């Protein structure tokens, strides 16, 4: 059993010990499905961390978006600093899939921008699954897409061991076959160079270099190096260098795949010609012939993923292998915010197939392109082993699958009760709301307001701003990482009120919010259903004086059930506090998200400084750094500033400007020390 070392400054409290014990017992007894029904702020992540530590299973934690996945990954890394906690999301900064619009005869080619840092994290996850058993992978729903063939990926790894004889030419050929490229001047991820008896490799899964030192034909030493300074970081006895891409196709299989593609093309052309679709047949023949030529010559072509079924040797209709297939047999699945995530799993396949069907019908792709797809919902659950659903409002499907295997977690370790819920009439609601906002603002507390329409949210935001309220408006067009920045500004007190159409956002931690306002609460629909109301009310559940105001003229069934459930939990919490002499206290979580800061910084640096907001922020910071007047810099800004200075330092070193690089190094050291002292 792998040894997880759970480190936390506190122990399980309230009903956490009972929930942990029940879940651990269920896993050990082989229960297929269980549900953790945990109210907002009760420490569900800590409970799951204890479950993983006590069962010792490799775990996949599935979240419904990359924002929540990053938040969970940060928390698990704090709980398990000595274990492998990995982050696996889609590596596209921008993605426009291939499509065809028959009405306007418009073909849209695939365009994408890959984030190299996310790609590195994805490779790090699969490498850890091959080499360790104490692995927790926090992933978004993108993990159900094809990810090569695990057995081929493992078999293709180039192995080096101290003392063994090495055929350097053969090893270099293997690296090239594994999508590494030779560059003797600028070595980064996915590249290698040879200097005399020294081979240096930039592995796809980390930012350190690997140096293989030879004495004749014998491997004399294997070392990890700092890519900028060349400093030796660690010596190794052996190492596996995994492919630079997850899709690895041996030459013999490639030849078989090319023949299979040619056979399918011949059959498809016959069908199209019989249907009188001569234009489509000509288009398909030209495109596929070009792709086949590229595959034969260089082993790659644009849109190669559309031939994934042939390259993997799969039969028609069979599911692709994905991240799940890299896990060992005894892995554990945790589905966070399962009432949303499980629904996403069902929707992914249908959306993908609708687009592919049009491309196939009009001669842009072979029918086998439809098998380059995400898993169907039923395929995913067949692959899944033991599963724990986690939600404050689990869906009916999860509860049915769990069949009574339910662990409820209602009591917060902080002693904070569920919010008071009050229903008020809509007449005069805006003036009443304005008065409530002013009360909270004086106490430096925050307010969330959720409306039914975008227009209503815009009008309300304008009205509040005209009345000297510090307010921001959150809408669907805002980039997910910019959204995090807006929420962090709310937490840091840059403004007092956040208005939006859908602010329930499962898993969002906002301890500063003391008031949640739901306008038009009696308008039945998705945004005012029982689960949505409970989730929205829960945004104030981390504040000692949390309150939810529902403006409505009628009491709907959804409202009644949501209010009843909130009151039930509140009574349980109050009774527990009185019995144990607990006084509610604030949660006090820091407003930070290191993974998102890291990824966003990378994305913006790749725009070559075109992002005005970044220039404005970093300009002030660099001025402060240059003048050594750093006392006014916020702690939350330091990780981003350090990352920027490291980039500048590496560029200076690359340009042989060593004095500037040394100066930047000293500043980085100073800011790291400040960060350590204050965290």
Swiss-Prot record:
Primary localization class, coarse: cytoplasm
Sequence ranges assigned to domain Helicase C-terminal in this UniProt record: 429-591
Keyword Hydrolase part of the UniProt annotation: yes
Domain of life: Bacteria
Domain UVR: 639-674
UniProt cross-references to PANTHER family, sorted A to Z: UVRABC SYSTEM PROTEIN B
Protein's job: The UvrABC repair system catalyzes the recognition and processing of DNA lesions. A damage recognition complex composed of 2 UvrA and 2 UvrB subunits scans DNA for abnormalities. Upon binding of the UvrA(2)B(2) complex to a putative damaged site, the DNA wraps around one UvrB monomer. DNA wrap is dependent on ATP binding by UvrB and probably causes local melting of the DNA helix, facilitating insertion of UvrB beta-hairpin between the DNA strands. Then UvrB probes one DNA strand for the presence of a lesion.
Quaternary context: Forms a heterotetramer with UvrA during the search for lesions. Interacts with UvrC in an incision complex.
Name of this chain's protein: UvrABC system protein B
Species for this entry: Prochlorococcus marinus (strain MIT 9303)
């Amino acid at each position: 059993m792998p040894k997880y070392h759970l480190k936390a400054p506190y122990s399980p409290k309230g009903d956490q010990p009972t929930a942990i014990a029940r879940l651990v017992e269920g896993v050990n007894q082989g229960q297929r499905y269980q549900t953790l029904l945990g109210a907002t702020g009760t420490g569900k992540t800590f409970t799951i961390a204890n479950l993983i530590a006590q069962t010792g299973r490799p775990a996949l934690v599935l979240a419904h978006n990359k924002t929540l996945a990053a938040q969970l990954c940060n928390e698990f890394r704090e709980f398990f600093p000595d274990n492998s906690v990995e982050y696996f999301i889609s590596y596209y900064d921008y993605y426009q899939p291939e499509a065809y619009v028959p009405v306007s005869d418009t073909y849209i080619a695939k365009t994408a921008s890959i984030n190299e840092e996310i790609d590195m994290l994805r490779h790090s996850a699969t490498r850890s699954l091959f080499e360790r058993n104490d692995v927790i992978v926090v992933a978004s729903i993108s993990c159900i897409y094809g990810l090569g063939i695990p057995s081929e990926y493992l078999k293709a790894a180039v192995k080096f061991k101290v003392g063994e004889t090495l055929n350097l030419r053969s090893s270099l050929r293997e690296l090239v076959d594994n999508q590494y490229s030779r560059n003797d001047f600028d070595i980064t991820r996915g590249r290698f160079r040879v200097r005399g008896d020294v081979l240096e490799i930039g592995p796809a899964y980390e930012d350190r270099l690997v140096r293989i030192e030879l004495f004749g034909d014998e491997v004399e030493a294997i070392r990890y190096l700092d890519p900028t300074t060349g400093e030796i970081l660690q010596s190794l006895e052996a190492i596996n260098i995994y492919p630079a891409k997850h899709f690895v196709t041996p030459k013999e299989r490639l030849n078989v795949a090319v023949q299979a593609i040619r056979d399918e093309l011949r059959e498809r052309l016959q069908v199209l010609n019989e249907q009188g679709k001569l234009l489509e047949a000509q288009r398909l023949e030209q495109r596929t012939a070009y792709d086949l030529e590229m595959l034969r010559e260089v082993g790659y072509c644009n849109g190669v993923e559309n031939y994934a079924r042939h390259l993997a040797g799969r039969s028609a209709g069979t599911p692709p292998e994905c991240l799940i297939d890299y896990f060992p047999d005894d892995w554990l699945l945790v589905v966070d915010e399962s009432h949303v995530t499980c629904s996403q799993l069902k929707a992914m396949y249908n959306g993908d197939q609708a687009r592919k069907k049009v491309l196939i019908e009009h001669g842009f792709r072979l029918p086998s392109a439809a098998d380059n797809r995400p898993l169907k919902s039923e395929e995913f659950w067949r692959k899944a082993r033991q599963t724990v659903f986690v939600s404050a409002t689990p869906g009916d499907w999860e509860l049915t699958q769990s069949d009574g295997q339910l662990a409820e977690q209602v009591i917060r370790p902080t002693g904070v009760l569920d919010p008071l819920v009050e229903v008020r009439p809509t007449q005069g609601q805006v003036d009443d709301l304005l008065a409530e906002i002013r009360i909270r603002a004086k106490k430096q507390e925050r307010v969330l307001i959720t409306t039914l329409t975008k227009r209503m949210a815009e009008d309300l935001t304008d009205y509040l701003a005209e009345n000297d309220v510090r307010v921001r408006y959150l809408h669907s067009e805002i980039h997910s990482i910019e959204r995090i920045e807006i929420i962090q500004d709310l937490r840091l007190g840059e403004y007092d009120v956040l208005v939006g159409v859908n602010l329930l956002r499962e898993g969002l931690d906002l301890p500063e919010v003391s008031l949640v306002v739901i306008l038009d609460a009696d308008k039945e629909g998705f945004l005012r259903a029982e689960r949505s109301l409970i989730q929205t009310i829960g945004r104030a559940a981390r504040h000692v004086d949390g309150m939810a105001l529902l403006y409505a003229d009628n009491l709907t069934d959804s409202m009644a059930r949501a209010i009843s459930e909130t009151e039930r939990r509140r009574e349980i919490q109050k009774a527990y506090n009185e019995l144990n002499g607990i006084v509610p206290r604030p949660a006090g979580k820091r407003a930070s998200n290191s993974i998102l800061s890291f990824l966003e910084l990378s994305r913006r640096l790749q725009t070559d400084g075109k992002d005005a907001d970044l220039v404005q922020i970093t300009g002030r910071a660099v001025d402060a750094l240059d003048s050594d007047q750093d006392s006014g810099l916020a702690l939350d800004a330091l990780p981003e500033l350090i990352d920027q200075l490291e980039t500048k330092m590496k560029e200076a070193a690359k340009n042989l400007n060593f004095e500037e690089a040394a100066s930047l190094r000293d500043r980085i050291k100073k800011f790291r020390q400040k960060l350590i002292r204050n965290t």
